[in-house]
Amino acid sequence: AWLCRNSWSDKTENNINSYFWLSYYDKSIEDAAWIFDFESADNYDYNYQYDGGADVGKLRGISTSANIFRAKKADNELVKAVSISLSKDANVPYTIRVYTNLTNLHKPKSGILAAKVSGTTTYAGTHTIRLNKAVSVPQGTYYAVVVELQKSGVGLDMEYAVSDSSLTSRVYCDYNQSFLYRYGSWEDVADVSTR
């Protein structure tokens, strides 16, 4: 069982000073539990990402995706790690490739393969995966992070817009930022997402 704290009130039944026990088998909780495990140190100078929306959907049948970034912060940055998010899938084999000096912003693999790392996730969630060797990226150049998942039935997380009585979230993707590989070619997410 979990020892839980009710942060809303200490005046509910079956609790002691706002704490109560909740069985793992209690049907009042959903089928997923979230635990956050953070690194204690700030290991990276910059974080390149395209932030999402308030809700995530699954793109089934697509195993490869990519993001293209432009190095802007320093004369010569080092890419040391890549994050991937698999909100509901565990034990997923992956291969991550980093390409530098891109020659075509519509093709994430159009540059030089600078790093490749493979592994398997052990739990669902967001993973920070360290590269075997840091990749040097000069200021102003474009680089791509390509992620390939090797487990059938796994869906890629993709944020989408939400609007209801308590929350409104708008999602927008610009061109030449994020890509999906399907039907034998790269497809820009800006053409897939709603604007």
What are these regions (language model features)?
Residues 108-122:
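Solvent-exposed serine/threonine-rich low-complexity stretches and specific carbohydrate-binding patches
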Residues 1-12:
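Catalytic nucleophile-His microenvironment captured as a short glycine-rich beta-strand/loop
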Residues 6-8, 133, 149:
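A mature extracytoplasmic/lumenal domain signature
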Residues 11-24:
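A short macromolecule-binding patch
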Residues 24-108, 135-142, 148-195:
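Beta-sheet-rich sandwich/jelly-roll-like modules and their strand-loop junctions
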Residues 125-127:
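Short strand-edge motifs at loop-to-beta-strand transitions and within beta-strands
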